[in-house]
């Protein structure tokens, strides 16, 4: 798997795939739309994004997270290795009348000068074979005291991403929380916290649903090392 596959991804997915990239997070499957919008709510909360916050997103893809953040008054900027992906992001920002800057950059090697208040890595790190390099880039994007938030599918992505890897040639790896925490410390981050995202789903008053809701924290404790989504927040020294 090469970086060129990441560069070519928007072309490789065809017309239907590009339409999804343009309309993300909204699609025909309401459950997927709900999942993505709930995740965005967690990003707002965990990074304390508000008007005037300077945010960069590494591996921004079509830029939907940064566009939604900009609607909150956030001063947002997105970076992605694919020029075509950046063009999609810029075009959507123009269509929506939103001011967001997008630039082509490799998240493993980008120097942003320690000027941002917050940095986001959402569903991006598993496309890199060198997460340590990406986290160093994230560290050097942040002012001292700035916060990084990363969301990753966990180690299971090595199995769930096989189809995409075989079809498009993209890198689809999964990293366990322990490795990511170690890499964060080595990059210079402190106050590393993990959060479990249950998306606060509604549940009925049927006994089986109530029992499942009560048992959920234990399940996250057991499965968190390799299966459930990873959310890590850290502070740059």
Label every model-predicted segment:
Residues 1-48, 149-171:
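Conserved class I S-adenosyl-L-methionine
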Residues 59-61:
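Class I SAM-dependent methyltransferase "Motif I" SAM/SAH-binding loop
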Residues 64-108:
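Class I SAM-dependent methyltransferase SAM/SAH-binding core
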Residues 96, 102, 112, 149, ...:
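A C-terminal cap/extension of S-adenosyl-L-methionine-dependent methyltransferases
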Residues 108-118:
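A short acidic, Gly/Pro-enriched loop at the edge of an enzyme's catalytic core
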Residues 132-144:
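A short glycine-rich, Lys/Arg-flanked "PGG" loop and its adjoining helix->strand segment in the class I
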Residues 173-188:
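Short alpha-helix
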């Amino acid at each position: 798997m090469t970086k060129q596959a990441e560069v070519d991804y928007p072309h490789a997915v065809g017309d239907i795939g590009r339409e999804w990239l343009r309309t993300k997070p909204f699609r025909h499957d309401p459950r997927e739309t709900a999942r993505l919008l709930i995740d965005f709510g967690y990003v707002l909360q965990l990074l304390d994004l508000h008007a005037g916050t300077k945010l960069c997103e590494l591996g921004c893809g079509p830029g939907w997270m940064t566009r939604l953040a900009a609607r909150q008054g956030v001063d947002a900027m997105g970076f992605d290795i694919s020029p075509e992906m950046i063009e999609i992001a810029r075009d959507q920002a123009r269509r929506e009348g939103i001011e967001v800057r997008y630039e082509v950059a490799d998240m493993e090697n980008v120097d942003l000068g320690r000027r941002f208040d917050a940095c986001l890595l959402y569903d991006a790190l598993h496309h890199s074979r060198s997460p340590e390099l990406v986290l160093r880039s994230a560290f050097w994007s942040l002012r001292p005291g700035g916060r990084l938030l990363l969301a990753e599918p966990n180690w299971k992505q090595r199995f769930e991403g096989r189809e995409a890897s075989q079809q498009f040639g993209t890198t689809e790896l999964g990293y366990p929380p322990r490795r990511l925490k170690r890499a964060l410390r080595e990059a210079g981050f402190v106050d590393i916290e993990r959060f479990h995202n249950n998306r606060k789903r509604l549940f009925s008053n049927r006994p089986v649903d109530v029992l499942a809701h009560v048992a959920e924290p234990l399940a996250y404790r057991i499965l968190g090392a390799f299966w459930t989504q990873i959310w890590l927040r850290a502070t740059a020294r």
